[in-house]
């Protein structure tokens, strides 16, 4: 029997798929599309947080209005929908680390941790408990079958590609996951499908901010989670001059130029380092932001050969989600640690961000790891 569109040798009606539904247009289209093809669809939405103000905030996933939108799609398309309370799991696995990372002078990426520790771990196990054959999401990334099993590839639409946020997907998870939107040419194509299915979310805005950070105000969330933890200190030039004072390192990120509160200087200055132990924000000229060597740990490797089977890998890497991949040499130190040498220096490389590995002249993702303070 030929394989169905999800890769199983049985009819869609006998193939159960759990769809992770955020209430946005992407996952809603995935659910409607699979239901339309005759699959046994089960929609699941996670209740991740409750910040009051965030509940009715459009453009943030998994708040109250989003649960309502997901449920409405399920009712209209005729498949079951469940809401799971993951608030405690989400706080322990994502929010606490987010706050502690900022206090340690890092710039975290909680969306990666959410995929790694919540959606592709606990939710995936729930999908197995529901006896689903696979789990589908609305992420813009592709799963392709290679000679050694499923591979992770960038989305067809480079502007929507979410590979940076999914580098920690393990081979075992990838075997179970499906990404039906990864091959689409644009977000417009997704919205057209939503309109064809008559979904009320067809024109719903994309999520912009971190879901549990209303209006993008990270500092207020951290102060609420860790009262009094943000300690004032000095703003210091890299040459040692004291230029001013600050209200806590949580208000600053590497590469920041605006809002430093140290006007009247002839040269533009940027945050080049956050010294938490001394409570110092270190600033300097732009050239001090250039970084060539990056220490990376907690590596998730998705190559066919073992990571340590070669002394070095010639790959492309991304050090921020908004940056294009740059050529690099990745030198394994262990199975989970490496030194990454950028062939062209990058500015504003920050501890807490991810360093994601890509095939040099192709679309395949080879995994990645976390940048840490060691340079």
UniProtKB/Swiss-Prot annotation:
Disulfide bonds: 114-211
CDD domains listed in its UniProt record: MnmA_TRMU-like (cd01998)
Positions bound to ATP: 20-27, 46, 138
Key word Cytoplasm present: yes
Catalytic reactions on record: S-sulfanyl-L-cysteinyl-[protein] + uridine(34) in tRNA + AH2 + ATP = 2-thiouridine(34) in tRNA + L-cysteinyl-[protein] + A + AMP + diphosphate + H(+)
Interaction with tRNA (site feature) positions: 139, 353
Entry GO CC: cytoplasm
Keywords: ATP-binding, Cytoplasm, Disulfide bond, Nucleotide-binding, RNA-binding, Transferase, tRNA processing, tRNA-binding
Region spans: Interaction with tRNA: 160-162
Catalytic residues (UniProt): 114 (nucleophile), 211 (cysteine persulfide intermediate)
Entry EC no(s): 2.8.1.13
Primary location class: cytoplasm
Gene Ontology molecular function: ATP binding; tRNA binding; tRNA-uridine 2-sulfurtransferase activity
GO BP, one annotated term: tRNA wobble position uridine thiolation
Protein's cellular compartments: Cytoplasm
Pfam families xrefs: tRNA_Me_trans (PF03054), tRNA_Me_trans_C (PF20258), tRNA_Me_trans_M (PF20259)
Family: Belongs to the MnmA/TRMU family.
Known function: Catalyzes the 2-thiolation of uridine at the wobble position (U34) of tRNA, leading to the formation of s(2)U34.
Name of the protein this chain belongs to: tRNA-specific 2-thiouridylase MnmA
Organism: Ruegeria pomeroyi (strain ATCC 700808 / DSM 15171 / DSS-3)
Protein encoded by which gene: mnmA
